[in-house]
């Protein structure tokens, strides 16, 4: 298969290099199109106000001065001279569990692939303090999942969010299909002073686990399993449709009220 690989940790990150090499060893044709620096937390942002510069590192690698979503968008809308078959994003050097997917550039790169018509997988290694020891485990998991997707495709609106415990392959207890868990609200932002005495802020850490019981991605990884969460991008809250529909009469009447 022709595999487009991207990430949010940057084109020089070890995770993406190990992933690309593992996919090549498995017989895939791999093109890496990734940010020229760390763009973690970029979510689904596209660069629309300035042109995006790219730099070919070699025949199989391109660095992009943009977000993960920019990378996949450019690669799939004309920058490459061929059409990939699948998008694989990662390997992220930290978890993308539960609410993390909202902010994750890793997941968003996969999501852009899905928007543009390709199967897509996001792969993250659940590390402690970003100190990764077993990228090769996550890479092997990705290779196995890509093979399964080729043999048994999923519905066209499905993205796979994969989180891998930072363990040797032999120590992983298995794969689990999971749902997204939830975190408590984020920790407070951290104020500091710059050299001129002006207040600046750091975004605080993600909140601790809240909904993290059996069946969630949090629980699977915590118990030594590789979590596979099928996700999609329909954000409609169907359970609220009837309630909001009940507002419509009053809202419509307000159109006739004096300004």
Swiss-Prot record:
Domain of life of the native organism: Bacteria
Pfam (any one): SurE
Subcellular localization, as worded in the UniProt entry: Cytoplasm
A single Gene Ontology CC term: cytoplasm
SUPFAM superfamilies on file: SurE-like
Essential cofactor(s): a divalent metal cation
UniProt-annotated binding residues for a divalent metal cation: 8-9, 40, 92
EC number, as in UniProt: 3.1.3.5
Enzyme class name: hydrolase
Keywords of the record: Cytoplasm, Hydrolase, Metal-binding, Nucleotide-binding
Reaction(s) catalysed (UniProt annotation): a ribonucleoside 5'-phosphate + H2O = a ribonucleoside + phosphate
Tagged with keyword Metal-binding: yes
GO molecular function annotations of the record: 3'-nucleotidase activity; 5'-nucleotidase activity; exopolyphosphatase activity; metal ion binding; nucleotide binding
Cofactor note: Binds 1 divalent metal cation per subunit.
HAMAP family linked to this entry: SurE (MF_00060)
Function: Nucleotidase that shows phosphatase activity on nucleoside 5'-monophosphates.
Protein family (similarity comment): Belongs to the SurE nucleotidase family.
Name of this chain's protein: 5'-nucleotidase SurE
Species the sequence originates in: Xanthomonas campestris pv. campestris (strain B100)
Encoding gene, per UniProt annotation: surE
């Amino acid at each position: 298969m022709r595999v487009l690989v991207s990430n949010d940790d940057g084109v020089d990150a070890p995770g993406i290099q190990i992933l690309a090499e593992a996919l090549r060893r498995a017989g895939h044709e791999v093109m890496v199109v990734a940010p020229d620096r760390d763009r973690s937390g970029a979510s689904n942002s596209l660069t629309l106000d300035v042109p995006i510069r790219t730099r070919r590192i070699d025949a199989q690698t391109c660095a992009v001065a943009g977000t993960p979503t920019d990378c996949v968008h450019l690669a799939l809308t004309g920058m490459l001279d061929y059409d990939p078959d699948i998008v694989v994003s990662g390997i992220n050097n930290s978890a993308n569990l539960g609410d993390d997917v909202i902010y994750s550039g890793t997941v968003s790169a996969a999501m852009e692939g899905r928007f543009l018509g390709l199967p897509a997988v996001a792969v993250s290694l659940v590390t402690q303090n970003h100190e990764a020891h077993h990228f090769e485990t996550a890479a092997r998991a990705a290779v196995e999942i890509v093979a399964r997707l080729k043999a048994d495709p999923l519905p066209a609106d499905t993205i796979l969010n994969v989180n891998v415990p930072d363990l040797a392959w032999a120590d992983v207890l298995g794969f689990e299909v999971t749902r997204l868990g939830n975190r408590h609200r984020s920790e407070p932002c951290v104020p500091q002073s710059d050299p001129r005495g002006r207040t600046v802020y750091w975004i605080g850490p993600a909140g601790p686990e809240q909904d993290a019981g059996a069946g969630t991605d949090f629980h699977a990884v915590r118990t030594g399993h590789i979590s596979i969460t099928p996700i999609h991008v329909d954000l409609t809250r169907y359970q609220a449709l009837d309630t909001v529909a009940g507002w419509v009469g009053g809202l419509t009447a307000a159109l006739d009220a004096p300004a």
